[in-house]
């Protein structure tokens, strides 16, 4: 059994075209044929699959409640948990700089890899098989999730925390966009102010402006130990 066979057993899916899996595991720092286009595809499929599951699971919930639960299930920390369960860091191809910086442990890289694998599965055997695999991955998470305040996304939780402390709201600014139009990486700066002075600046990246802003807000929540 080779190392990719072991990974296939962990994710519960066997590829017909193993080259798709190899590409899904390849970070942009390692090769020109990397996983960002697959990540773009997988992100959309994951959002649809989880939205459909929640729609049927919670027939009495309104759009806002469903959206918050979906955001919880598809956000970066949740995907990173799945990635660690699969031990994806042991299988990824990263450039030397990312390896030295511990990229195989970074939540954003792990989360992106999960989405890329989803995209690769859809190209390999289609949507029906892929959505079933995703549902298998999320079986316990879907069973445990419930509507409520704890489902609010990171930006909302940070905003409510600052408002409760009568502090200015954070500002988000896109400071860099890399890549071609179909697979861009956004870098966002989030500044948190207190009493008119800038206290901290946090920087995060994502495959969309929304993802980068959420990742920056998540960093601040962790720093401030806000649940």
Swiss-Prot record:
The keyword rRNA processing applies. SUPFAM superfamilies: dsRNA-binding domain-like, RNase III domain-like. Residues 4-126 form the RNase III domain. Keywords: Cytoplasm, Endonuclease, Hydrolase, Magnesium, Metal-binding, mRNA processing, Nuclease, RNA-binding, rRNA processing, rRNA-binding, tRNA processing. Its main location: cytoplasm. Its cofactor is Mg(2+). It holds the Pfam family Ribonucleas_3_3. Its EC number is 3.1.26.3. The active site is at 43, 115. SMART domains: DSRM, RIBOc. It is found in: Cytoplasm. One of its GO terms (molecular function) is ribonuclease III activity. Homodimer. This is Ribonuclease 3. It comes from Haemophilus influenzae (strain PittEE). The gene is rnc.
